[in-house]
Amino acid sequence: LKFSGAYLSSAHLPKIAQPLLHSLSSQTGMCHSVVILDNHEVITVACSYLASAEKNRVLPYGIHNGNRIAAHTASNGKIILAYMQDQELDTWLEHYPLTRSTKYTVTCGQTFKQQLHDIRDQGWCLAVEEHEVSFIGFSVPIFDGSGRVVAGLNTVARSEQYTVEQVMNRCLVPMQELAKQLRMLL
């Protein structure tokens, strides 16, 4: 397992987030995670368990601490990338090509940058089948006390079980509230 400077500099985040994530899961009935950006990937540093999954400590959709996925393919990566300064994002795009995970993955740099601009304007990110077919990802940013995005808070749902509207209605406000709590604690 790789340990990054990004993780080491935010090592207190998992301890702070963990009990809040469990409370959020109790409220929404869904699993949630906190991720940080590590080069071209996001890494899960804290995740919640539903009561039904608690016994086996197995989470749906491959969500577990240490899990890594390409940042540009998932809502939790896009929410972090959306808050990068333009020059920083351009450098990131030069180093990390937008490879395709599914037929819905955005691979055009200009389209991707516009999508990130829209995400930043709305303050949340929805990714439907971009990382994996049949999955909806939904994320909000986690800011530190100085106003810098340090992580993403997300949930993932199977599109056979939930519509986009159901995910949004169930999760948007509670996730935004939890992100505000974390900001005050960071």
Q: Where are the regions a protein language model picked out?
A:
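Juxtadomain coupling helices with adjacent low-complexity linkers
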Residues: 122, 133-134, 151-186
